[in-house]
């Protein structure tokens, strides 16, 4: 992951909240004094597409999304590649190729302690060992995290993480049960995640709430309390225990698997 910058550390100390409207509108809109906060519920209309969004590496202060291009232990030899994240005809396309995975992450201005994130996604052909994570939010300093993950051919799972005794620990996982079970190859889904730091996370599928976690539900009462931002990725769990996602079978040279994210919104 990208090293912590002084600007990011300052941002997190201030717990900056930057609601998004669509992809390219990142201005802050403070809540008027005395008014209740707007409800965090999915929108009925189509999500904004990716037209006008540019993916270039290392534009952390000027570009709303940046592609990843490094490796992590969980990936084994399938590190993030710039070639595996692209916007084509207004859609985000994330690919896995032999020995490479694809990821983008929001810039640091997108950190929020309260927000609703949504994606409209068509999943790839799923396979054992393949992880499709079309939407998750994370803070690499506080280790707060909330995930949607399609795990191999087992289904769609949700998990909540935070820092416990200095370690990144899963503190809630819907009892280990998938939200949607089985092989979800080619499924088109509208996923949403409403986060209120220290209070709750609600997960939506196709506009319906399907799971909710609060501190009372979390292991030891540990719960995310910091600002988080969005990540979207498709990757191979080659560096993890195959008992989780299954055993990945390497592809032939030139083969690829692709996840298409048609729209995205943070509000």
Question: For the regions a protein language model found, what residue spans apply to each?
Answer:
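N-terminal secretory signal peptides
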Residues: 1-21
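Short, tryptophan-glycine- and acidic/Ser/Thr-enriched carbohydrate-recognition patches
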Residues: 48-81
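Short carbohydrate-recognition loop motifs
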Residues: 83-99
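Secretory/extracellular carbohydrate-interaction modules
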Residues: 94-159
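Extracellular/lumenal carbohydrate-interaction signature centered on repeated Trp-anchored short motifs
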Residues: 107-117, 179-187, 223
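Short, aromatic/His-centered strand-loop micro-motif at the edge of beta-sheets
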Residues: 166-188
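Localized edge beta-strand/strand-to-loop motifs within extracellular or lumenal beta-rich domains
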Residues: 187-201
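Aromatic sugar-binding interfaces of carbohydrate-active proteins
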Residues: 200-259
């Amino acid at each position: 992951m990208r090293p912590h910058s002084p600007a990011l550390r300052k941002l997190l100390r201030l717990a900056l909240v930057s609601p998004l409207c669509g992809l390219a509108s990142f201005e802050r809109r403070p809540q008027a004094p005395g008014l209740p906060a707007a409800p965090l519920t999915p929108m009925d209309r189509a999500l904004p597409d990716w037209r006008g969004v540019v993916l270039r590496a290392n534009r952390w202060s000027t570009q709303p999304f940046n592609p990843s291009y490094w490796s992590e232990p969980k990936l084994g030899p399938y590190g993030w590649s710039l070639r595996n994240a692209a916007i084509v005809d207004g859609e985000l396309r994330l690919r896995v190729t032999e020995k490479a995975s694809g990821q983008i992450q929001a810039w640091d201005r997108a950190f929020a302690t309260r927000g609703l994130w949504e994606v409209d996604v068509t999943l790839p052909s799923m396979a054992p060992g393949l992880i499709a994570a079309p939407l998750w939010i994370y803070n690499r300093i506080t280790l707060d995290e909330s995930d949607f993950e399609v795990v191999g051919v087992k289904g769609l799972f949700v998990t909540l993480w935070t820092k416990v005794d200095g370690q990144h620990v899963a503190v809630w996982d819907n009892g280990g049960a998938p939200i949607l079970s089985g092989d979800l190859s080619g499924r088109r889904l509208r996923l949403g995640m409403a986060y209120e730091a220290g209070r709750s996370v609600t997960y939506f599928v196709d506009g319906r709430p399907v799971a909710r976690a609060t501190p009372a539900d979390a292991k030891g009462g540990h719960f995310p309390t910091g600002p988080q931002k969005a990540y979207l990725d498709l990757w191979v769990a080659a560096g993890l225990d195959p008992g989780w996602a299954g055993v990945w079978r390497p592809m032939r040279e030139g083969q690829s698997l692709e996840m298409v994210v048609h729209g995205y919104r943070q509000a």
